[in-house]
Amino acid sequence: VIQVPLRLLKFQPGQARVVSATGNVQLGGSPMAVGASVPEGGKIQTGADSSAVVELADGTRVKVMPNSLAEVVSNRDYAMRDASKSGSTTWFSGLIRLAQGVLETTATRTQNRATPLQVETPTSLVGVRGTQFRVAYEDPVKKDARTEVVEGLVRADNTAQNSGADLPKGTGAVINPAQREVKVVTLLAAPDLSALPAEVSRPQGQWPMPALAGAVAYRVQIAGDEQFNGIVRDIKVTGRTVDLGSLDTTRWFARVRGIDAQGLEGLDSVKQVAVLAPPPPPPPPPPPPPPPPPPPPPPPPPPPVRF
C-alpha cells in the first residue's frame, strides 16, 4: 500500500452553511444570516444569549454556543480512488478552531474521512470519526480545555505535553498544558426533571434545580426548539433556582445538566416549561359608603305661655 501525504492530494473546498443563527451572531465581523456560506478561515462570533449552527461539507453540525469565537480552518473534499463504477470518490477533512467559549458537535458517521474531524483549542486537540461531544475553552488565564463525550468515542490530546487519552461515551477530561496526564472522568448522570414544575409565572419566574449527586452547579439552556439550535439563554446556576422571568410568555425547552467539582458538565435532561404572564392585579376595593346624613335640628322650643 502506497501512502500519499494529504498535502499532495487534490481537494475542493467544501460547502459550509449556516443552519441557524439566533441573537447577535457575526461572521467575519458582519451579521450572519441563515443560509450564508462559511468559507475556510471564516470566524463566527456569538454574543450573550446568542448561538449558531454551521453544517460542514460532510453533514457534521457544529453548534457555536453563547459568548464564543470559532473559526472554520479547513472544510475540504479530497479526491480518492475506489472500486466504484466511476473509480473515484471524495474523502472529507475538517478542522474547527475554538478560540473562546463552547462548541457542541454532532459528527456524521462516515468511513470516508481523509482525517478525523478535529476541534482545536489553544491547549488541546480533539479528533473524532463520528460522535456527539462538547469542547470548551472559557478561561484563557487557567488555560483549561474541557471535552465531554455524549455519544461515540473521542481522542483528546494535550498538545503542550504530547499526551492524550481516548474518551468513550459518558466520559470527559480537563486538559491543562501544565499537566501531562489526561485523566478520564465519568460524567455526571442526567438529572431527573420529572418533579420540577412545568410552568413559572412572571415577574419572579423562579424555577428550582433538581437534586443530583456530585453536582456543585448546573448548566441551564433555554431554546424555542427541541434540537436547541436557537439557544436564547445559557446560564450557569450556583444556587437552588434559576430565574426565567425575563423570557417571553410562551412554552420553552429547558436543558439541564450538572457540573462537577472539576468543571466538567454532565449528561442532559430536557423538559418543556411554560412562562406565564403575571396574574392580573386584584380589583380595587369598593369605595366607602357615604357618611350618614346629619341628624335633623331639634324643634324650636314652644313659645312661652302668658297669663
Language-model features, listed with the residues they occupy:
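Conserved aromatic anchor
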Residues: P203-G214
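Short beta-strand segments within Ig-like beta-sandwich modules, predominantly Fibronectin type-III
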Residues: I231-T238
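Extracellular fibronectin type III
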Residues: A261-P278
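Predominantly extracellular/luminal cell-surface or secreted proteins
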Residues: G28, Q221-D225, I259
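Short proline/glycine-enriched turn/loop motifs at strand-loop junctions of beta-rich domains
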Residues: V19-T22, L212-A217
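Flexible, surface-exposed loop/linker segments and immediately adjacent secondary-structure boundaries
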Residues: V1-K43, L56-P203, P304-R306
